[in-house]
Amino acid sequence: MKKITAAKKGLKGQVTVPGDKSISHRALILGALAEGITEIENFLVAQDTLATLNCLEKYGVRIERRDTFVRVFGTAQNFSEPQDVLDAQNSGTTLRLLSGVAATFPFVSVFTGDASLRRRPMKRVLEPLTQMGARVLARGQGDYAPFAIKGGKLRGQDFILKKASAQVKSALLLAGLRAEGNTSVTEPQLSRDHTERMLVGFGAKIKREGLRVEISGGQKLLGQKVIVPGDFSTASFFIVAALIVPDSHLIIKNVGLNPTRTGLLTVLKEMGANIQILNFHENSGEPVGDLEVKYSPLKAVEVPPEIVPAMIDEFPILAVAMALAYGESKVRGAEELRVKESDRIKSIVSEFSKMGVAVKELPDGFIISGGNKILGTTVDSHHDHRIAMSLAVLGLTAAGTTEILNADAVAISYPEFFQQLTKLTEGA
């Protein structure tokens, strides 16, 4: 349990957030598949990324880590058969991306995860991998971990996804890297494109036309130096905290600003947020900059479904901004939130309601009437890191103490979150 009290002062000064989780995962995987050595700076050290690292080591990949510096000794796409089950723990990225890799090898890989991950749907990845030629045996009519994959000679396919998903797209591109012929993925909206950018950075040739991306099989990857920017999803908690705590003026340094990730900035600015981008530049193929955020009175907003993929991880913290905004805000087209680490729609509705927020559940989103007094009480993260951090930020504006059960879930992506929040709000 973690106790949060109202912020004693505005959030001021500068803060640096840990390395991007999505890019850290992909740097490990592409480095393992490449020829030569890949060096990763500012690697995110958290439960999810370490799950990927541990799985790769079970494939026989040699990896050296010294704090946030990682050296991966590439295998030139020659993994060894794992002698043990591959445990993705709570990480959907680990499970889905490595499924695409596993489908290319002529041996059996057995995957599992924690109780939460074993409830998350996998058919959206496993079915297309089967169409490419992999053999898959999965629990729950082919939809859930644990599952086994025996790969081999894959055939390139053209896939049209019903829902935009960076994890599904990435798994299919990684499988296509070793398939015969070309593999293409077309999405209804553009999801985050770190995999495409990084494949190019590692020497692969891909074609990108609008919502379609295509990769040809048989390509080699070459080890690279990857400098991981700060994680925008992690920065979002401090962005919203600075917007809602009076007298705040915060600069968040070196944040990844990939346009497929920053839908939250668009929505917050529509709500009246005072956010400026400073020192904009590119690093390892990714746009990066500093964010200057000042306290801002916010007004309600309706989030259009087409922007959902560009902010899929930020809805819990957006809900905090909506709770403090004037008027009625609405989110639609976000049913994907129901199959995250928790059912995030239900988690937002149940826990925010306890704190006095007027929130209504929709099948694919929620409605929040902002402006109610926020009340400190006991709430539950539902073992979801983003729910835990969002409740903590909401607690900064609450009357009384907010007690968060299962707050240790933050270790999944940001183990030092509460220490950093305390420094910013109490001047420690």
Swiss-Prot record:
Pathway: Metabolic intermediate biosynthesis; chorismate biosynthesis; chorismate from D-erythrose 4-phosphate and phosphoenolpyruvate: step 6/7. Signal peptide: none annotated. SUPFAM superfamilies: EPT/RTPC-like (SSF55205). GO terms for cellular component: cytoplasm. Belongs to the EPSP synthase family. One of its GO terms (molecular function) is 3-phosphoshikimate 1-carboxyvinyltransferase activity. It catalyses: 3-phosphoshikimate + phosphoenolpyruvate = 5-O-(1-carboxyvinyl)-3-phosphoshikimate + phosphate. 3-phosphoshikimate binds at residues 21-22, 26, 165, 167, 313, 340. This is 3-phosphoshikimate 1-carboxyvinyltransferase. Its EC number is 2.5.1.19. The keyword Cytoplasm applies. One of its GO terms (biological process) is chorismate biosynthetic process. Phosphoenolpyruvate binds at residues 21, 92, 120, 167, 344, 386. It is an enzyme of class 2 (transferase). The active site is at 313 (proton acceptor). Monomer. Keywords: Amino-acid biosynthesis, Aromatic amino acid biosynthesis, Cytoplasm, Transferase. It is found in: Cytoplasm. Catalyzes the transfer of the enolpyruvyl moiety of phosphoenolpyruvate (PEP) to the 5-hydroxyl of shikimate-3-phosphate (S3P) to produce enolpyruvyl shikimate-3-phosphate and inorganic phosphate.
